[in-house]
From Swiss-Prot:
Domain of life: Bacteria
Cited PROSITE patterns: IMP_DH_GMP_RED
Gene name, Swiss-Prot/TrEMBL: guaC
The protein's name: GMP reductase
InterPro entries listed in its UniProt record: Aldolase_TIM (IPR013785), GMP_reductase (IPR050139), GMPR (IPR005993), IMP_DH/GMP_Rdtase_CS (IPR015875), IMP_DH_GMPRt (IPR001093)
Organism encoding this protein: Aeromonas hydrophila subsp. hydrophila (strain ATCC 7966 / DSM 30187 / BCRC 13018 / CCUG 14551 / JCM 1027 / KCTC 2358 / NCIMB 9240 / NCTC 8049)
Cited SUPFAM superfamilies: Inosine monophosphate dehydrogenase (IMPDH)
PANTHER family listed in its UniProt record: GMP REDUCTASE
Binding-site residues for K(+), renumbered to this chain: 181, 183
GO molecular function, one term: GMP reductase activity
Length: 347
């Protein structure tokens, strides 16, 4: 047993230190990034925010809307092949360039993913997603799918430490998904005692990935546009959002009437709700590691997207970054004990 004495930080522990800027308006800030991926040398250009591969967030409808903002969607793995075929046949190939095909690590997942990718050459992204990216089985699956799909960009996770980021990149991942336990409907830290404060995880994992020519996704922990900006400021190349995009028209979640007001069900993918729906219940050898909540129905997601992107643009103007790429170079975080004045409630 050993104890690491270094203090690790989450988004609530810091604020940006403002800096002099020559920018006159938020409209001068570009949030578009261009990446060349390590294993394929293919390029992608867009706004590096990704809708999470949760079945109440990462839907086909969400993908269509976010693509209009040049954002990405990791479409959840529970759509059938027939549903994928319909989506692909009805969708502009340019839009498919903003879609990730999500998969688990079973043999059935592997076979299904290859069948989906064969539907269109425009499907270039694979999201290999497990809760625990530290298992040898996961690394072996990553090598297998890299060998089978040499021309596809692979996102793999989740991990929270630099050495495992390096392992995944060297095993075939172009992008590594970072985050264990920070999500709004994740209870892993409570059920297992395992986790890592998200901002420190991003800072440390970004350093490891960039040294090998890879990228990272900060996955989880963002509750407001300022948190998204902090993730980018900490070095994340992409930021993945679940709860911030939940309960919208495009989500496909179950709508529940509560005292005449519409609410939408939102749950973690390791929750009993998810396992009841997709796995026939919680297996006797495991515990649920997610919660189920009802969120007020929020209408079309485009208004929320504009709020998030507007907040990040504003961050850039405060620190003098004319492009999102410059934000991490212009970032100085200050440690704080308070974030906002809540005398009249939270934003």
């Amino acid at each position: 047993m050993r104890i690491e004495e270094d203090l690790k930080l989450g988004f609530k522990d810091v604020l940006f230190r403002p800096k002099r800027s020559t920018l006159k308006s938020r409209s001068q800030v570009s949030l578009t990034r261009q990446f060349t991926f390590k294993h394929t040398q293919t390029q992608w250009q867009g706004v590096p925010v990704i809708a999470a591969n949760m079945d109440t967030v990462g839907s086909f409808a969400m993908a269509r809307t976010l693509a209009s903002f040049e954002m990405m969607t990791a479409v959840h793995k529970h759509y059938s092949l027939a549903q994928w075929q319909t989506f692909v046949s009805e969708t502009d190939p340019a839009l498919l360039g903003h879609v990730m095909v999500s998969t688990g690590t079973s043999e059935d997942d592997f076979t299904k993913t290859r069948q989906i990718l064969a539907m269109s050459s425009a499907l270039r992204f694979i999201c290999v997603d497990v809760a625990n990216g530290y298992s040898q089985h996961f690394v072996e699956f990553l090598r297998k799918i890299r060998e089978a799909c040499p021309n596809h960009v692979i996102l793999a996770g989740n991990v929270v430490t630099g050495e495992m980021v390096e392992e995944l990149i060297l095993s075939g991942a172009d992008i590594v998904k970072v985050g264990i336990g920070p999500g709004s409907v994740c209870t892993t830290r409570v059920k297992t005692g395992v986790g890592y404060p998200q901002l420190s995880a991003i800072i440390e994992c970004a350093d490891a990935a960039h040294g090998l020519g890879g990228q990272i996704v900060g996955d989880g922990g963002c509750t407001c546009p300022g948190d998204v900006a902090k993730a980018f400021g900490g070095g994340a190349d992409f930021v993945m959002l679940g709860g911030m995009l939940a309960a919208h028209e495009e989500c496909g979640g179950e709508i529940v009437d509560v005292d005449g007001e519409p609410f939408m069900k939102f749950y973690g993918m390791s929750s009993s709700s998810a396992m009841d729906k997709h796995a026939g219940g919680v297996a006797e050898y495991r515990a649920s590691e997610g919660k189920t909540v009802l969120l007020p129905y929020r209408g079309p997601v485009e208004n929320t997207v504009r709020d998030i992107l507007g907040g990040v643009r504003s961050t850039c103007t405060y620190v003098g970054a004319s492009q999102l790429k410059e934000l991490t170079k212009r970032t100085t975080f200050i440690r704080v004990r308070e974030q906002e004045n809540n005398v009249y409630g939270k934003e």
